[in-house]
Amino acid sequence: MEHTYQYAWIIPFLPFPVTISIGLGLLLVPTATKNLRRIWAFFSVLLLSIAMVFSADLAIQQINGSFIYQYSWSWTINNTFSLEFGYLIDPLTSIMLILITTVGIMVLIYSDNYMSHDQGYLRFFAYMSFFNTSMLGLVTSSNLIQIYIFWELVGMCSYLLIGFWFTRPTAANACQKAFVTNRVGDFGLLLGILGLYWITGSFEFRDLFEILKNLIHNNEVNSLFAALCASLLFVGAVAKSAQFPLHVWLPDAMEGPTPISALIHAATMVAAGIFLVARLLPLFTVIPYIMNFISLIGIITVLLGATLALAQRDIKRSLAYSTMSQLGYIMLAPGIGSYRAALFHLITHAYSKALLFLGSGSIIHSMEPIVGYSPEKSQNMILMGGLRRYVPITKTTFFLGTLSLCGMPPLACFWSKDEILNDTWLYSPIFAIIAWSTAGLTAFYMFRVYLLTFDGHLQVHFQNFSSTKNSSFYSISIWGKEVPKPLNVNLFLSTMNTNEKMSFFSKNTYQIDRNGKNRIRYFSTQFGNKYTSMYPHESDNTMLFPMLVLVLFTLFIGFIGIPFDQGVIDLDILSKWLTPSINLLHSNSGDSFDWYEFVTNAIYSVTISFLGIFLAYIFYGSVYSSFQNLDLINSFVRIDSKRILSDRIINGIYNWSYNRGYIDVFYGKVLSNTIRGLAELIHFFDRRVIDGITNGVGVVSFFVGEGIKSVGGGRISSYIFLYAFSVSICLIIYYFFRF
């Protein structure tokens, strides 16, 4: 067993040869390297698969024996300071290794087909392999310095991949935004690491935890300074895991290729912040108020992410805000002392969200031949609808991923999310109310995405997205005010002012008659695509296979954490995998499982989720058109004052959600403009004052020299006379002031 642990250091470096080989190949033999580009995809998958096998072996040993192994190499700087580099294998490490490798393999297989048309295919796989190496190195690090090194490498890879299509201004701006926002967190993390080293004199986790615990217990350290250092460490996790208020980079990160979105949101970048909190949890628990701070940030992020997802039209941005909200749940759990639930939800959410992002990539892939390759069109849910008949496999996988994220049993996220929701009652009723309410919002906005994408009819044929004002085609609206005059049911298509506000819940569907189909066929031929079919098509098997594998994970991964132990079979593998002493809320974890409490809480959570799904079906499903035909909705709002009030509330919610809570506007107008103004002021002072003084001295010296040169005339007698005259003047002044 120990023999396997001794070679665990190889795991992070297994994907790295692909990056080196592609880089050297493109530099030395670019033509041959490009001709064999599919071979590099094969080697990427192969090497990461070997890493997965090693990781699975370590995980099995961890489950059976809970053996913790650490090995370090010392690098002595001088007699008083040395750095140690090594690796640590414990339950947390083995969980993250399995998560990164399994999701990474699925994303690499998917990317082979998804990126096959792209000129940057090889560059993409080089970045991806380096991304996996960086994340694997991060989770196996044995000290804070090593974590910081790989932390920066993860940030660099995310910057390269978010801005992969750097010729697009939006992608270039997005990667810069992600980089700058994470600079704030990384700077906080560095300050926190240095502060803790100043207190404890060690970067090693075990030594650091033990020394700090003793210092705080004996009141030998300033508790405020220790809390500040811990808060700075947490700031790094806040930025990396897109927690409030450093979440603004996450939706813009969707400018990168969809496989990268899946990897970032499931197993790499956003998981790095959660991993850091989990790794440093023994430190946070001994410092007052830090746990409260972590839980507060988590619950704010839970609610904020859910509300911002309500009005998004881009399918990937909707999923991004969903990730933000779910990461809030995961961050909330360790803050309230539920360490096990946090890692459980990290696992289940990773597979479900990877499935959803790969599904969205399949949807985008099917829409691009029809609407073009611009993300504003191919990712716009307004132009979708009715895709269930064109992409049935993608629809089924996306549906299962949506149900899982909504917390529907027996799918994966139901078990982990319910555990967090139940634990919030033990911590704070206010936090519990917010967390449970957000569970309903999650079901609402996730089924909003599903219904806008797959329900009804293909809306692209009804849309005017060519920016022409004189189009006679109706633009389907999602949010805003209804057109006040009644719809003429005899017209197949009606006009609408393009400047009109979007409607809040409207998703109009129409019966397509024979004339309508003819008009659709005529309209669709105007795009001039090379594809003969003007309807979406299912993705290739290479893209569908990873999605089907992730469906299996979504169906069955939740069973590893079910706390059922009836003496015959113990399904709770996760509890044996993790260290139970860290779970602060359940010190009596060995007690028998309470079936009644579990079923009661499950009924409540599922009911709330069903309510959100029901509301989504009413406002976005095909049934909404029936309500419109029966005029049931208008019967509830016939009183003008009530309708005006409801419209104001609805538009207020829409403006809040669509404008991202005005947080980006605040950062842009207050922080960015203030910093830019300060920079311009400093630039003016440097150029006019500092440079002015320097240049002024030079100019004055020049003119003085020229004047002296003209007076001297080149004769030695003149120089002697001026020298004697100057000395005489100085002596007279000295004599005068002395007496």
Curated annotation (Swiss-Prot):
Which GO cellular component term is one of those annotated? chloroplast thylakoid membrane
Q: What class of enzyme is it?
A: translocase
Q: Does the keyword Translocase apply?
A: yes
Q: Which organism is it from?
A: Acorus calamus (Sweet flag)
Q: Which reaction does it catalyse?
A: a plastoquinone + NADH + (n+1) H(+)(in) = a plastoquinol + NAD(+) + n H(+)(out); a plastoquinone + NADPH + (n+1) H(+)(in) = a plastoquinol + NADP(+) + n H(+)(out)
What is the recorded function of this protein according to its Swiss-Prot or TrEMBL entry?
Answer: NDH shuttles electrons from NAD(P)H:plastoquinone, via FMN and iron-sulfur (Fe-S) centers, to quinones in the photosynthetic chain and possibly in a chloroplast respiratory chain. The immediate electron acceptor for the enzyme in this species is believed to be plastoquinone. Couples the redox reaction to proton translocation, and thus conserves the redox energy in a proton gradient.
Q: What is its main location?
A: plastid
Family per UniProt? Belongs to the complex I subunit 5 family.
Q: Does the keyword Transcription apply?
A: no
EC number(s) on file: 7.1.1.-
Gene Ontology molecular function, alphabetical: NADH dehydrogenase (ubiquinone) activity; quinone binding
Q: Which Gene3D superfamilies match?
A: 1.20.5.2700
* Superkingdom of origin organism: Eukaryota
| Membrane topology field | Multi-pass membrane protein
Localization (cell): Plastid, Chloroplast thylakoid membrane
InterPro entries noted in UniProt:
NADH_UbQ_OxRdtase_chlpt_su5_C (IPR002128), NADHpl_OxRdtase_5_subgr (IPR018393), ND/Mrp_TM (IPR001750), NU5C-like (IPR003945), Proton_antipo_N (IPR001516)
- UniProt KW keywords: Chloroplast, Membrane, NAD, NADP, Plastid, Plastoquinone, Quinone, Thylakoid, Translocase, Transmembrane, Transmembrane helix, Transport
Q: What is this protein called?
A: NAD(P)H-quinone oxidoreductase subunit 5, chloroplastic
Which terms under GO biological process does the entry name?
ATP synthesis coupled electron transport; electron transport coupled proton transport
